[in-house]
């Protein structure tokens, strides 16, 4: 069985980590640098940093904060937000990121996935997809979940993998911040065909949700969460201990 990863997510706006429900109602949580350092020591396998309003506000992301975060962490760091060109990939990787997550930028210009994969390798290219149920199907949303693209999420993910994305982060808007469990149906649909690692995002409320995720969707590679880790409702060390006791392979 593949070793499962536990990944805290830092959603950053105006230089501060924030949280919300269903991608709305954002409230301030903490400093991204402080949280990044905490999670490195807490046993997180990786860290994801999203500048969540960069695309919506049509600006570059906060590279100064990324550099500071990268200096503090000794685990793989994925950075996203406002990634619209291959030059943006270059800028973020030079700040110390290990992987770059592209979302709205790839919707506007799908060729960015293949171009970045060719230049930096697929292992550096993460396709982040914000998906929501619309009329019985999974639909792709852009600009931080604000804009319905009309695109079928499963087809978009399939296309992204074929273009060179080396990893998928699947964010379910329906379950985001609700803390009632991951979107298992959506994850099963994606993992049924995905040939690259899939990270589940949106909905974690307790340790049991992670156990259910990994036991139900066996092909999912990692669980990503924000608020339950930020507010210490779930400690990563405790989570990993419980996962191991339930027969799920994790790095302790």
Model regions and ranges:
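Glycine/small-residue-rich loop that forms an oxyanion/phosphate-binding "nest" at active or ligand-binding sites
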Residues: 53, 61-120
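Structural preference for beta-strand elements that scaffold enzyme active sites
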Residues: 5-9, 46, 74-78, 99-101, ...
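Conserved, mostly hydrophobic/aromatic
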Residues: 11, 39, 47, 79, ...
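Glycine-rich, proline-tolerant flexible connector loops at the mouths of alpha/beta enzymes
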Residues: 46-64, 104, 169-180
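Catalytic cores of alpha/beta
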Residues: 77-96, 185-220
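Conserved anion-binding
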Residues: 12-19, 97-170, 174-175
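C-terminal helical cap(s) of enzyme catalytic domains, especially alpha/beta-barrels
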Residues: 113-120, 214-252
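Alpha-helix-loop-beta-strand connector modules within alpha/beta enzyme cores
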Residues: 57-78, 115-130, 180-205, 247-248
């Amino acid at each position: 069985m593949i070793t499962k990863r536990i990944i805290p997510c830092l959603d950053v706006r105006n230089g501060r980590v924030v949280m919300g429900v269903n991608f709305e109602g954002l409230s301030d949580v903490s400093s991204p640098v402080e949280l990044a350092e905490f999670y490195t020591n807490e046993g997180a396998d990786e860290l994801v940093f999203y500048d969540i309003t960069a695309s919506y506000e049509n600006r570059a992301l906060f590279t100064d904060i990324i550099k500071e975060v990268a200096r503090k962490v000794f685990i793989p760091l994925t950075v996203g937000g406002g990634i619209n060109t291959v030059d943006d990939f270059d800028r973020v990787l030079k700040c110390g990121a290990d992987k770059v997550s592209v979302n709205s930028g790839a919707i506007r210009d799908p060729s960015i996935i293949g171009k970045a994969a060719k230049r930096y390798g697929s292992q550096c290219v993460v396709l982040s997809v914000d998906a929501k149920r619309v009329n019985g199907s999974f639909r792709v949303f852009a600009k931080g979940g604000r804009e319905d693209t009309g695109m079928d999420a499963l087809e978009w993910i399939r296309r992204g993998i074929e273009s060179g994305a080396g990893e998928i982060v699947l964010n379910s808007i329906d379950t985001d911040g609700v803390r009632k469990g991951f979107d298992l149906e959506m994850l099963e649909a994606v993992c049924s065909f995905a040939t690259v690692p899939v990270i589940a995002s949106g909905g974690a409320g307790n340790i049991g949700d992670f156990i259910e995720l990994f036991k139900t969707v066996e092909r999912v590679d990692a669980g990503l969460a924000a608020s339950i880790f930020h507010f210490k409702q779930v400690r990563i060390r405790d989570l990993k201990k419980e996962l191991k006791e339930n027969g799920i392979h994790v790095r302790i």
